[in-house]
Regions:
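Short, charged/polar, low-complexity loop and linker segments
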Residues: 17, 57-64, 152-160
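N-terminal, Lys/Arg-enriched amphipathic/low-complexity engagement segments
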Residues: 42-47
Length: 250
């Protein structure tokens, strides 16, 4: 079959899978989940969580006993947030797999290394991404349904909101590392495609990535690169550069 810099026609056809073309739809759904979680947290921060609630007036005031302490709205929002971020992480790892697997990468070298058979390239980085996704999947199991009665059954239902918050925090940290690994692989793949150029936004992201992580010429420990780029993902530097190049993504 006729070959091109992007592989044979059959290889190019194999590159088009749901995980590639579905990315905008999945990211859109995840953004909706983030917006909902944020709205619940902001409502809680601006609300009253006391019990009872006191209303002072000239006659001495009144008080109402209720359950404003109940954190279920936030717990549900954070559960949704954890699920959304985990899904984004899994999708990222699957795209990473297509960059590293020479049977799926449309002509890129195996594991994005010049020395296939002698160097591992980014193979072991995928192990890290896979492990982080597996942990996120476990953490995205709901905690809000795990209420245990306490205080002689007076407090017989609680939101488990703090547990959902701690889970979501770890899931987010994992996702930042997974995305960092995918971006490292993406930059490596772009170097192998030179002198071809990508779109303005992609090239802007590439410049930021290469400012922090060098091309993987030979095998080296990648943990420092991953941690450094994960911090860049968290900072929003890549998003800022992309939006400067192509406009707001909202």
């Amino acid at each position: 079959p006729r070959s091109t810099p992007f592989g044979t026609r059959r290889q190019r056809q194999m590159c088009i899978r749901d995980r590639m073309r579905s990315t905008p739809q999945v990211i859109g759904a995840a953004r909706d989940a983030v917006a909902y979680a944020r709205s619940q947290v902001e409502i809680e921060l601006n609300g009253v969580g006391d019990n009872p609630i006191f209303f002072p007036d000239d006659d001495g005031g009144t008080y109402l006993t209720g359950a404003n302490f109940q954190g279920t709205p936030m717990a549900f929002g954070l559960e949704m947030l954890g699920t959304a971020i985990t899904t984004v992480s899994v999708l990222s790892e699957r795209r990473l797999n297509r960059l590293l697997n020479r049977n799926l990468s449309c002509g890129l070298p195996a594991f994005l290394t010049k020395g296939a058979g002698m160097f591992s390239g980014m193979m072991l980085a995928q192990y890290t991404a896979g492990a982080l996704c597996c942990e996120a999947r476990i953490l995205s199991a709901p905690a809000a349904t795990g209420s245990i009665p306490a205080a002689a059954d007076q407090e017989d239902f609680v939101s488990m909101g703090m547990t959902t918050a701690l889970k979501a925090k770890q899931i987010l940290k994992n996702a930042q590392a997974v995305l960092a690994i995918e971006m490292m692989a993406g930059a490596q793949a772009m170097d192998f495609r030179r002198p071809l150029k990508a779109g303005k936004g992609t090239e802007a992201a590439y410049e930021v990535i290469r400012k922090h992580v060098a091309f993987l010429e030979e095998d080296r420990p990648l943990h420092a690169d991953i941690n450094r780029l994960a911090a860049v993902v968290e900072s929003g530097e890549i998003l800022e550069a992309v939006e400067k190049a192509i406009g707001k993504l909202d």
